């Protein structure tokens, strides 16, 4: 009979993502001037206000006001009509120094023996249903948001778009867990009030005309551009172009009030969007605003790196990797693997987990070094998910009061590199 599976994504202007991007912008600025910074930065955004709180231990200084205003402006909140804009929003800082007790558990005489910054379990997942080794429903939902944001920034089509938006994609699977079609696509996008009651004859007529226009543009502009610009597999292109897809566009009928004025946003509230869209599992720890001594972040990236390379090497078609840590302890407490019965080698999941232990050094310091996590790479992760992107180099410029500007070339999304495939094949005799 098969089944349906659904995942969602959100835009850069979603309130929770605004908060994530501010937290990671603060983190990046501190790491740019002091790579050994310890940071836990939490942000709340609401009508006309940004509150930044958390714990920091660093030799760098962050110009919080400039960082916040630049981040909000880059996202697109630049108009007073939004009731949250980069020029006028109030900014409150409640940042203080990191606890000595936590710092004592992390610092060691030898950096290699650096302890984990907290306890917890972290998961990495990969499958082979997309070329990014990501689940198809989340991959498509993310592609829709990336394309919609590109359209908004270009300002040539769908010129009524505002920054806040969400997507949701429901995929049909057969009994063998193979994607066979797309059942439903949902797009909710904030928009200007581009047809007035005076022009339409009544407010109801204006709302209906705006909704009809947005629905048409989603189907005739957003979907074709997503297929052309984001989807590379012929089978998935065909699925997305099918005539029998059910479309839900702005189901409430109108979406003018949005962003932090419509909903208060908090750092760390989109952890499923940030990872695998509900596939696999999640340990509960958020990523944004945390330096890599926090294994919530660094070990989740390491687990994704392991999972992706194992699937790419042909060990399994699907895999979930769990790592667990204790605060102050360097070595992981446990390594767990689940291949869902889809392994291609004559080994049990437990035996695969032992291979993982020998192939990958999973101490926090080793993860930081291998994935280059002590560099200012995090703002880019806070939008459109932390997993599934192409690794790339980028030159970034940072400003700090009393110091010359700093230009740094960084490598983004290192945990998406397929640099362990050959080692894994050799270890498994493939």
Protein language model regions, located:
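Internal helix-turn-beta structural module
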Residues: 46, 318, 325-430
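Short, charge-patterned binding micro-sites
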Residues: 39-59, 327-331
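C-terminal catalytic subdomain
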Residues: 269-271, 276-322, 331-339
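Alpha-helical support elements that line or immediately flank enzyme active sites
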Residues: 8, 12-31, 129-150, 290-314
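Glycine-rich, mobile lid/loop segments that gate access to catalytic sites or pores
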Residues: 6, 66, 73-257, 388-392, ...
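Conserved phosphate/anionic-ligand binding catalytic regions in large, soluble enzymes, centered on
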Residues: 8-10, 14-19, 115-130, 256-281, ...
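N-terminal, positively charged regions that mediate nucleic acid binding
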Residues: 1-40, 45, 421, 427-430
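A short glycine-rich, hydrophobically flanked beta-strand micro-motif that places a catalytic Asp/Glu
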Residues: 39-41, 165-171, 245-249, 315-326
């Amino acid at each position: 009979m098969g089944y349906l599976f659904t995942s969602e994504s959100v835009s850069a202007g979603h309130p929770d993502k605004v908060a994530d991007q501010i937290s990671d912008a603060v983190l990046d600025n501190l790491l740019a001037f002091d790579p050994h910074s310890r940071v836990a930065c939490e942000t709340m955004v609401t009508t006309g206000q940004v509150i930044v709180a958390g714990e920091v231990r660093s030799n760098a200084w962050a110009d919080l006001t400039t960082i916040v205003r630049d981040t909000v402006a880059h996202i697109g909140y630049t108009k007073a009509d939004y009731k949250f804009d980069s020029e006028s929003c109030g900014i409150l800082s409640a940042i203080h120094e990191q606890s000595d007790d936590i710092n004592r558990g992390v610092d060691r005489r030898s950096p290699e023996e650096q302890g984990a910054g907290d306890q917890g379990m972290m998961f990495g997942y990969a499958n082979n249903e997309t070329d990014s080794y990501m689940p198809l429903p989340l991959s498509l939902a993310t592609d829709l948001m990336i394309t919609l944001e590109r359209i908004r920034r270009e300002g040539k089509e769908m010129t009524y778009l505002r920054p806040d938006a969400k997507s949701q994609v429901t995929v049909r699977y057969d009994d063998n867990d193979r994607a066979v079609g797309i059942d439903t696509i949902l797009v909710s996008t904030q928009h200007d009030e581009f047809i007035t009651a005076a022009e339409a004859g009544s407010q109801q007529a204006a709302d209906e005309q705006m909704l009809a226009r947005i629905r048409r543009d989603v189907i005739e502009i957003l979907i074709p551009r997503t297929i052309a610009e984001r989807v590379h597999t012929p089978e998935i292109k065909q699925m997305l172009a099918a005539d029998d897809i059910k479309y839900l566009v702005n189901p409430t009928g109108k979406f003018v009030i949005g962003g932090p004025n419509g909903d208060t946003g908090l750092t760390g509230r989109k952890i499923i969007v940030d990872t695998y869209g509900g596939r696999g599992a999640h340990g509960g720890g958020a990523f944004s605003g945390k330096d890599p001594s926090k294994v919530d972040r660094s070990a989740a990236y390491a687990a994704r790196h392991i999972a992706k390379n194992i699937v790419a090497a042909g060990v399994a078609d699907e895999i979930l990797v769990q790592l667990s840590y204790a605060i102050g302890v360097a070595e992981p407490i446990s390594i767990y693997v689940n291949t869902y019965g889809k392994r291609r080698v004559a080994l049990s999941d437990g035996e695969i987990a032992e291979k993982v232990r020998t192939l990958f050094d999973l101490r926090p310091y080793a993860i930081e070094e291998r994935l280059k996590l002590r560099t200012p790479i995090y703002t880019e992760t806070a939008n459109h998910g932390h997993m599934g992107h192409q690794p790339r180099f980028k030159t970034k410029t940072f400003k700090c009061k009393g110091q010359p500007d700093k230009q740094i070339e960084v490598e983004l999304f290192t945990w998406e590199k397929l640099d362990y495939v050959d080692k894994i094949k050799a270890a498994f005799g493939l």
